[in-house]
């Protein structure tokens, strides 16, 4: 079996949706410009040698439809030779693509693949524009298959005894860690600056355009405090505990990695960043989908021949504080190594992009902490009752 390495990894900043800094930017544009930036960092790579562009997206319709990955390949590489395929496993789509790319290279089916994810929740809302439910399923007692994510977060909070106070504390800490990371410029090296053109009608009724560059995550709020979080009303259930403040933010963003065979890495004289050791997905009850990592993490560890204590750093997607805390407690995760720079409650959760985004963040933080030869993990819950986990060995 061949060895597959990740040689480059970049992401955009994450903007709030639907009225944030990227509301005037299409998803395919965000993705294409990220890939262009990455290609500029690889001048020795002939674009025609790239075998595929694999893009994760959770809501592939509207401006994200029509096999967006192929359009991203055409736009980002500016040649027709490289195909593209869009992949959807909801919130784990972005790391699912890295798993597919790695497996294809290991099997000898490819030598070089761009993998990642992109999502604009400003362009395509959660559940898409016109979901069509299977009412036979609903009428047969499976309405939880279609539960909104907030309802599942309430179910997790109730079943696993996660208090409102603990959820708000977790959310507060997420913002504090993210703000500290921003103040220390810990994200700067991983973020691709994106130019946005905003067209509007000025005071004289004339069409005008202004431009700005986005290179900083929009989500972390300096004014966040425990008192304000405690005053927020539950959003999903009367008397519930899940609020807008202890839930992830709707977001826009893109993130990509370049995966190469060992032979190509040596030929191009590149230094690999990391390798995907194992990726696993698992199923759980849809009504408590947030607990998905509790099944996915042990599965990934077992397949990799590793133990939980072998993991030095973890990026756990904070879909909700309730499910994040439930996962941490059920598995006994060391909170000192989980989301050291904050998570999705502060930094945002651009659905199909998130798995790739968290991978980029993981590599950069492991580099800063000089964790060569150690293992890191990216994990998340997934809608309709799934969990996913990817284990990486950091190299350089």
Model-derived regions, located:
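Conserved catalytic cysteine-centered active-site region
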Residues: 25, 57-111, 132, 144-151, ...
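N-terminal extracellular/periplasmic Venus flytrap/periplasmic-binding protein-like
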Residues: 11-12, 24, 28-33, 44, ...
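Active-site-proximal alpha-helical scaffold in enzymes
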Residues: 88-118, 157-186, 256-263, 328, ...
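Conserved beta-ketoacyl condensing-enzyme motif
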Residues: 23-113, 118-135, 191-214, 287-288, ...
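Short, well-ordered amphipathic alpha-helical segments that serve as non-catalytic structural scaffolds
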Residues: 27-43, 68-72, 97, 149-156, ...
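Active-site pocket-lining segment
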Residues: 152, 187-190, 277-346
